[in-house]
Structures are given as structure tokens and as C-alpha cells.
């Protein structure tokens, strides 16, 4: 940095964008192979290369920002804009999933029995595990904010405690979601309901796992004194990402679990009973 005449970071050539793209291709292709041919070899190869890429890319960024001093205020401003655009792109992913769900549920076709949920589908009760998951993520949003304020106030002990609580809640959410998938009476291949349900909630679950990994890295960095009260964008980005995951879950809960499953099935049952009583009269 002593020989630079500008505040920007001229990044050295890095192989990680290429290896990340190739591992994403392997992971996606492996997922297709697993779904259609019950072969998980390619998927685990993609997952392994993805994890290795994440580790080494994260290592390089930490070295550049913490030990080499390349993350100047100007660079941090660019990183903030980049993180905002990344989260915005993720928002559009979920808009697509919600669009597919509402397109199918607001005007169900005759093939679905003209009702939503489709005939033969027994939706999950939103007042059981989904409601517990909602409270868990809301609590984790409070604890991550506590961690952020503790970091800005220089309270290292409370920051570590709050971060541990957030990570624990995130892992607990993932375990409950996996149990819910295992016990569900329908699968991803059960028509448009199963597809939209598992793709939307599964993609969100993947984001929870990624966010938990992000927070674990932040916890390790805090233990090694990488963050200060004025220089902690790595943690700030993780907190933004976690709040995004929280907000998306609220929309998922209200749309898919409550309105699209439980509430719609109650309306369909009431309509059916009223029609039956009318025909009997």
C-alpha cells in the first residue's frame, strides 16, 4: 500500500472465480443426475470443489483485508454496493419462486382438481414446526443485531456470545427443516404443489446453511481479533445476509405455509361443505 497512488485495490489474478463457476456447474449437474438417475457422485464432487473454493477464496480476502490493509474506505464502499446488488439478485430468485407458486395457486387448473392444495395433497400444519421455525429465525435476527451493536461498542465477550446464539439458532432451524422434509406426506415430484414447496423452501434452507457458514467464519475471525469497532465489513455483510434470510422466511411462511396450504384448505373444505348442504336441500 505504501507504493500506491490511489485507494483502490488492484486484485491479483485469482483462479477462484473460475473454480467456483466450474464447481457450481458440477453441483447443478450432479443434482440433476441425483434426481433423475439416483447417482450422487457428481453432486458430491461439485460440493467438495465448491467448499474448497470457498475456503481458499475466503482465506485470500481475509488476508487482503486484515493483514495487507487493502480494504480502504473506498474499497469497503465498493464491497457494500456489491453486497447490496448480490442480495438484490437473490431477491429476484425468490420473486420467481413466489410467481410460480401464486400462478399455480390463485387459478388452479382442472388437472389439479380445481382447488388448492391439489386433491390428494395433505399440507403441513403452519401452527406446528413452521411456526417454531419462524420464532427461531426472528430470535436469531435479534441476536445478530445484539452481536452487531456489541461489536460497535467494543464489547468482545457479548459479541461472541450473541454470535454463538445466532449460529446455534440457524443450525437448529436447519435440523427442524430437515425433519419436516423427512416427515412430509408429499415429495418434490408430487405435481406443482410439491415442486413449488420444496424448491422455494429448499432454496431458502440452502441460504440458511450458507448464512450459518458465513457467521461461523465471522466467529472464528472474531476469536482471532480480526474485527474492530470501525473495521468489520465481513461481519456487517453476514448480518445483512442473515436479515435477508429472515425476511424471506416471513414471506414464505405467510404465503406457502399459511395462506397457500392451511388457510386455502380450510376455505376449500368450507366451500365443499356448503355446496353439499345446498345440494341436499
From Swiss-Prot:
Q: Where in the cell is it found?
A: Mitochondrion inner membrane
Q: Which GO terms describe its biological process?
A: mitochondrial electron transport, cytochrome c to oxygen; respiratory chain complex IV assembly
A GO molecular-function descriptor? cytochrome-c oxidase activity
Q: Which residues lie on this side of the membrane: Mitochondrial matrix?
A: 1-15, 67-72, 153-155, 224-232
Topological domains on the Mitochondrial intermembrane side lie at 35-40, 106-128, 184-190, 257-281
Task: Report the domain of life of the source organism.
Answer: Eukaryota
Query: Where would you find the membrane-spanning parts of this chain?
Result: 16-34, 41-66, 73-105, 129-152, 156-183, 191-223, 233-256
Which reactions is this enzyme annotated as catalysing?
A: 4 Fe(II)-[cytochrome c] + O2 + 8 H(+)(in) = 4 Fe(III)-[cytochrome c] + 2 H2O + 4 H(+)(out)
Enzyme Commission number(s) from the entry: 7.1.1.9
What is this entry's stated membrane topology? Multi-pass membrane protein
EC category name: translocase
Task: List the InterPro entries.
Answer: Cyt_c/ubiquinol_Oxase_su3, Cyt_c_oxase_su3_dom, Cyt_c_oxidase-like_su3, Cyt_c_oxidase_su3-like_sf, Cyt_c_oxidase_su3_a-hlx
Recorded GO CC terms: mitochondrial inner membrane; respiratory chain complex IV
Keyword entries, A-Z: Membrane, Mitochondrion, Mitochondrion inner membrane, Translocase, Transmembrane, Transmembrane helix
Q: Pfam families of this UniProt entry?
A: COX3
The UniProt entry's sequence similarity note says: Belongs to the cytochrome c oxidase subunit 3 family.
What functional role does this protein have? Component of the cytochrome c oxidase, the last enzyme in the mitochondrial electron transport chain which drives oxidative phosphorylation. The respiratory chain contains 3 multisubunit complexes succinate dehydrogenase (complex II, CII), ubiquinol-cytochrome c oxidoreductase (cytochrome b-c1 complex, complex III, CIII) and cytochrome c oxidase (complex IV, CIV), that cooperate to transfer electrons derived from NADH and succinate to molecular oxygen, creating an electrochemical gradient over the inner membrane that drives transmembrane transport and the ATP synthase.
Q: How does the record describe its quaternary structure?
A: Component of the cytochrome c oxidase (complex IV, CIV), a multisubunit enzyme composed of 14 subunits. The complex is composed of a catalytic core of 3 subunits MT-CO1, MT-CO2 and MT-CO3, encoded in the mitochondrial DNA, and 11 supernumerary subunits COX4I, COX5A, COX5B, COX6A, COX6B, COX6C, COX7A, COX7B, COX7C, COX8 and NDUFA4, which are encoded in the nuclear genome.
- In Swiss-Prot or TrEMBL terms, this protein is called Cytochrome c oxidase subunit 3
Organism field:
Didelphis virginiana
This protein's gene is called MT-CO3
Amino acid at each position: 500500500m505504501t507504493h500506491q497512488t490511489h485507494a483502490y485495490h488492484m486484485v491479483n489474478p485469482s483462479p477462484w472465480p473460475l473454480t467456483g463457476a466450474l464447481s457450481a456447474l458440477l453441483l447443478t449437474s450432479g443434482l440433476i443426475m441425483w434426481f433423475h438417475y439416483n447417482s450422487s457422485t457428481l453432486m458430491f464432487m461439485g460440493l467438495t470443489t465448491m467448499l474448497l473454493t470457498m475456503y481458499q477464496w475466503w482465506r485470500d480476502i481475509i488476508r487482503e483485508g486484515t493483514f495487507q490493509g487493502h480494504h480502504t474506505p473506498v474499497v469497503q464502499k465498493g464491497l457494500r454496493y456489491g453486497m447490496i446488488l448480490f442480495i438484490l439478485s437473490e431477491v429476484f430468485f425468490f420473486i420467481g419462486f413466489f410467481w410460480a407458486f401464486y400462478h399455480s395457486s390463485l387459478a388452479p387448473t382442472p388437472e389439479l382438481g380445481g382447488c388448492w392444495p391439489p386433491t390428494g395433497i395433505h399440507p403441513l400444519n403452519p401452527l406446528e414446526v413452521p411456526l417454531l421455525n419462524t420464532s427461531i429465525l426472528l430470535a436469531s435476527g435479534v441476536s445478530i443485531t445484539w452481536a452487531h451493536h456489541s461489536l460497535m461498542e467494543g464489547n468482545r465477550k457479548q459479541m461472541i456470545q450473541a454470535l454463538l446464539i445466532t449460529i446455534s439458532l440457524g443450525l437448529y432451524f436447519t435440523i427442524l427443516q430437515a425433519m419436516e422434509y423427512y416427515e412430509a406426506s408429499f415429495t418434490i415430484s408430487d405435481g406443482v404443489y410439491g415442486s413449488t414447496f420444496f424448491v422455494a423452501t429448499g432454496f431458502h434452507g440452502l441460504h440458511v446453511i450458507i448464512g450459518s457458514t458465513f457467521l461461523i467464519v465471522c466467529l472464528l475471525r472474531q476469536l482471532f481479533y480480526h474485527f474492530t469497532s470501525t473495521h468489520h465489513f465481513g461481519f456487517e455483510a453476514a448480518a445483512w445476509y442473515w436479515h435477508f434470510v429472515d425476511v424471506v422466511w416471513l414471506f414464505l411462511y405467510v404465503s406457502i405455509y399459511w395462506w397457500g396450504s392451511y388457510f386455502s384448505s380450510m376455505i376449500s373444505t368450507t366451500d365443499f361443505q356448503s355446496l353439499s348442504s345446498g345440494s341436499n336441500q
